[in-house]
Amino acid sequence: MSLASLARALSRRSAPSSSRARQGFSLGGLGGTTRSPPPPSSPLPSLHGGEGGGLGLGFVRGYLTAALGRPAAVKAGTDWRSILANPQFRRLFSDGSKKNYENYYPKGKKEAPKGDGSNKSDSKQDSSTDDQWNFQETASKQLQNFLAPLLFLGLMLSSLSSSSSDQKEISFQEFKNKLLEPGLVDRIVVSNKSVAKVYVRSSPQSNSQGQNTDAIITTNDVPSKHTPSRYKYYFNIGSVDSFEEKLEEAQEALGVDPHDFVPVTYVAEVNWFQEVMRFAPTVFLVGLIYLMSKRMQSGFNIGGGPGKGGRGIFNIGKAQVTKMDKNSKNKVFFKDVAGCDEAKQEIMEFVHFLKNPKKYEELGAKIPKGALLVGPPGTGKTLLAKATAGESGVPFLSISGSDFMEMFVGVGPSRVRNLFQEARQCAPSIIFIDEIDAIGRARGRGGFSGSNDERESTLNQLLVEMDGFGTTSGVVVLAGTNRPDILDKALLRPGRFDRQITIDKPDIKGRDQIFRIYLKKLKLDNEPSFYSQRLAALTPGFAGADIANVCNEAALIAARSEETQITMQHFESAIDRIIGGLEKKNKVISKLERRTVAYHESGHAVAGWFLEHAEPLLKVTIVPRGTAALGFAQYVPNENLLMTKEQLFDMTCMTLGGRAAEEVLIGRISTGAQNDLEKVTKMTYAQVAVYGFSEKVGLLSFPQRDDGFEMTKPYSNQTASIIDDEVREWVGKAYKKTVELITEHKEQVAKIAEMLLEKEVLHQDDLVRVLGERPFKASEPTNYDLFKQGFQDEEDSKNQEAAKTPQPDDDGTPSLGEVVPT
């Protein structure tokens, strides 16, 4: 019988049961004592609930009284009766609808609403009511699932723990003097050969008049004779033989006839509370393991993070795949990808083939098995793969290369098999493996792979799945990496990755397109096209991720300044923040150091201004940025694919301009030129030892490894000495020319330095006022020309608008829009 039906039955019988609770109905204890018949004036309620024949409260009270063997259980039963009879408590265990709330139950709404004139407010109210009821229903079901076991467990533990609270422990001497000598002992039950339970005769007056049954001892704490016995006292015995001997001696001393000796019975009882507590740690441990296994299967698991779709301990060999299809939300399309038109065209061929395979099959063409996206970090490899998933319209399975590696042996190959099996089941499909270099590294040689056995097994399984004996068509594999040089050659061969699509950093046109995409999402004071070209000119060498960071930094700076729109000043501050680091205006710098930095940066500006092949200066500042830079000069370099010897020489001179200015104008040098000297040394060594510009070294090239693990030089010591002497000579020539240039324009260098000390930041317009126009004109427009072109167009438009506004006549007659004071 369910708890709901039990509660309803108890509520129906609550009133009669409460009246019968005061009547003389008593059950014996566990020792088997018989009931005393009630007086004729008090009818005894039946065990099945009296007249109704149902399960009444008397049965529950009687059962609890018999089970606990104590009168206190009657009071506890009365308390439980009032709780169970509460309608709100019964409603927790009922699946039926509440009274007068049937219309609010979603399950009861089977008929469609009549008419179509319902307004939106009613529908919203109904939906909110349904959501509220769904939450209440879910909470109620969860409460039903947990409350019943907890209630039963609490009732059992409370009854078991307090079952012996009404029994009093006495000594054998007290038993002999107060109970055995007056002849009040009815019988003795020895439990488990250790405890002697004494059943004494209770007072008949306590049952007939409804008094407290705990008062079984009459005046002077002596019970009456010839009454039904109850278990009230107990004492511990050392051994059965000793107890029987002492009991027999005591009764013989009292002159009791052997036929009237107190009967002694031996029982083996189970203390349920002790048994439960003994098995409680084991049950708790088993339950904990069960809950952990359920949680691992639902999300928090081995081999995967928390969340939906995690791998359990029994599913650790399955790949955790992010699957997308045509119904997925938050898709990325090819129109959201810019700056890599050639790579996008190659990827779009895969999409076109999957959508229209007959067009290619009629020509005898086969779709490539895979394509490897290669490029520097932040160029949009993963974004291009997301666009492929959004445009293809076929299932797209994405996984990271590190997801194949696990602490268990054999998990990697198993996940590769599971991944391709899932892809073949929904073919045609696309698999994208991001950062494939985690499992695609070149295998070890000579059997000395060591700890890479698991990775090599995973790679072997990937090779077999892509182009092996049992390979099936319809699955295209895309992969992304920025380390193609370390991949295994077997992975790069045609038949597996047929194409290598290189995604380089965007040029100025690509950056313009990328800026247009990100600027559409910002609140600007002008159109996105107003900023895109000049920002593209200001950010040479920036990848797509860097451009996104610039836009985000500009928005943060505008929000920090409590601005409602983003302006060009915010974008320039964002670019300075990314290039130079965090601005530190509060950094403590002495006046002498600040003056040295000002002359150093002024030397860079003047040297670059009067050198033909030097990059044009955009801005110079002495505001400290980053961790070490006390000032910097920002240039707008041209993205030249080829560099001449003269260009490199002028760039070397410009880099040495700060050191030359310190020597010429201040008269002493500082450590501020350390970074400049490092750049000059690297640039000059490249000219001599790599580019073949030196006549003494000849047409030889010794490129250095980028990783710095080159143990031996690929040339002799004599050649190394020639290279060192040549580099030293070239740097000396460049520095000599720079000193002459700074000496020639000493006054201008000092004037710019004083302006820097006053303003801290100078732009090209300030330099033009001091130095005049640059004496060199480029034959083709440079990045700086493109940057200035936007401002020139803005000034022209303002001038045109000013020309269109009406002007006052010469005779003093006011125009239409002029206000004349009176």
Swiss-Prot record:
Residues in the active site?
A: 601
Provide the residue span(s) of the region labelled Disordered.
Answer: 1-50, 103-131, 202-221, 781-822
Please give the coiled-coil regions recorded for this protein: none
Pfam family of the protein (one): AAA_lid_3
Where does the record place Low complexity bias?
A: 1-25
Annotated GO molecular function terms are:
ATP binding; ATP hydrolysis activity; ATP-dependent peptidase activity; metalloendopeptidase activity; zinc ion binding
Cofactor binding annotation? Binds 1 zinc ion per subunit.
Give the binding site residues for ATP. 375-382
Q: Could you tell me what this protein does?
A: Probable ATP-dependent zinc metallopeptidase.
This one is known as ATP-dependent zinc metalloprotease FTSH 8, mitochondrial
The scientific name of the source species is Oryza sativa subsp. japonica (Rice)
Q: Gene symbol?
A: FTSH8
